[in-house]
């Protein structure tokens, strides 16, 4: 289970020194649009939409913007009604590191072209669908924060149908489950008094590539920064592991 948190830990540590924190308004709004389009445009009845709205509010996106995004997804907005779809792209970074990119786009050709340029300029290459996804498993993950009694967390996790959990920090834990059980697990944890700060689908690497070369590490983080900076990109996942010391040198 330790492998679950390697990429998640890298992302958390990287966020501390990143100039940009979290997602842009554009990326968060698109998540709402896609969620509203893929289900009913009512957050009370659409878990994906409810989660997207919670993330937008946490990023201080105004309610007017949130309502506009819901209307766009529902097709009831009077202005621009561009149709966004969720697409997964796959490729390799420097040293053969596997990279998955989840995107929300209204123009597949534009997104693919932007990604291809990002990869080629940073020592990687955009591959075909399926070239690296077999190295990952998709899971539902609930992030729990606050003072955590591990015994109580174990009991609540079992009750909620979790597969495993991991204490990641003094006051943070991640609980893993099948993607179809994420909403039920999140609700069970909340009912048991836990503060669930995020509930998301996450790609978990089945194995990790150890990165020890400083130049490779810098190239990897530059590539990931470039990919994450694209408006169409929602999330980037990679299957490498790195020491905290080398990571600090690579992203400073």
Swiss-Prot record:
Isomerase recorded as keyword: no
Sorted UniProt keywords: Cytoplasm, DNA-binding, Transcription, Transcription regulation
Domain of life: Bacteria
Pfam families recorded: TACO1_YebC_N, Transcrip_reg
GO MF, any single term: DNA binding
A single BP term in Gene Ontology: regulation of DNA-templated transcription
Localization: Cytoplasm
Annotated signal peptide: none
GO cellular component: cytosol
InterPro entries to which the protein is assigned, alphabetical: Integrase-like_N, TACO1_YebC-like_2nd/3rd_dom, TACO1_YebC_N, Transcrip_reg_TACO1-like, Transcrip_reg_TACO1-like_dom3, YebC-like
UniProt record similarity statement: Belongs to the TACO1 family.
Protein name from the UniProt record: Probable transcriptional regulatory protein Npun_R5651
Taxonomic lineage: Bacteria, Bacillati, Cyanobacteriota, Cyanophyceae, Nostocales
């Amino acid at each position: 289970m330790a492998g679950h948190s390697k990429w998640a830990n890298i992302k958390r540590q990287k966020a501390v020194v990143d100039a940009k924190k979290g997602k842009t308004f554009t990326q968060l709004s698109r998540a709402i649009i896609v969620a509203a389009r893929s289900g009913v445009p009512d957050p009370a009845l659409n878990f994906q939409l409810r989660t997207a709205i919670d993330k937008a509010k946490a990023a201080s996106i105004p309610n007017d913007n949130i309502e506009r995004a819901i209307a766009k997804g529902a097709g009831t907005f009077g202005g621009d009604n561009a149709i966004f779809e969720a697409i997964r792209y796959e490729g390799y970074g420097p040293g053969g590191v596997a990279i998955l990119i989840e995107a929300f786009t209204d123009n597949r050709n534009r997104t693919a072209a932007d990604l291809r340029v990002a990869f080629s300029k940073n020592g990687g290459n955009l591959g075909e669908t399926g070239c690296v996804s077999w190295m990952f498993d998709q899971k539902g993950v609930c992030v729990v924060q606050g003072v955590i009694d591990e015994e109580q967390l174990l009991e609540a996790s079992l009750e909620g149908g979790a597969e495993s959990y991991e204490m990641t920090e003094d006051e943070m834990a991640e609980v893993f489950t099948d993607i179809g059980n994420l909403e039920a697990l999140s609700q069970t944890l909340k009912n048991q008094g836990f503060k669930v700060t995020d509930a998301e689908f996450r790609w978990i690497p089945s194995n990790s590539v150890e990165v020890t070369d400083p130049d490779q590490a810098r190239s990897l983080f530059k590539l990931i920064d470039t990919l994450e900076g694209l408006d169409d990109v929602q999330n980037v996942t990679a299957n490498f592991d790195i020491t905290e010391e080398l990571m600090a040198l690579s992203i400073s």
